Amino acid sequence: AQALCDYTAQGGTVVVTYWTGVVDESDLCYLGDTPYGLTDLLGLRREEIDALYDGETCHCAATDDGAMEADGSILCEVAALNDTDPATPLMLYAEDYYAGCPAVAVHAFGKGQAYYLASRFNADFYNDFYAQVCEKAGLQPAWPEQLPAGVLATRRGDFVFMQNCNDHSVDIDGVELEKYSTRLVQLEPVDEDDES
């Protein structure tokens, strides 16, 4: 927990999801405020965890500070904002007894930002959310175009590893990537002397 706090204070961006800081490495529940060791970093504390039935969802609405809305599933964590130095809610639960509680929040900590996701959302939400977080953090995608679902791109220097995790082949910019395969793509190096 301290390493995450130090990283964020120095300008890093951290995303914390539901179930974070509930138990230790021996699977014993922490006593006291949770997420354990992260309440100051996140600007909130978890008060309760509500498990949802299969197929049940809880709608979450955007706040004035957030532009997204989504339905949470699996569970809904109920968190209260810290009295001093609270997080800024980006989405609030819109129904049930936790209506008005933060479902997604951001907290400025030192030179960085810490995000808290209190429920499980769908893939479209995560795509939009992480695109916004990466843009704010100044991160560039490993591949310039939107990739099909199930395809991962990881950049290492002038190389991009394209991984197809699908049970079917996909076409990426005219190159077929077979099912369950990896392809190495070499990018053209940028000559910094030629930039003006």
Where are the language model's segments positioned?
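A conserved amphipathic helix/loop scaffold
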Residues: 1-196
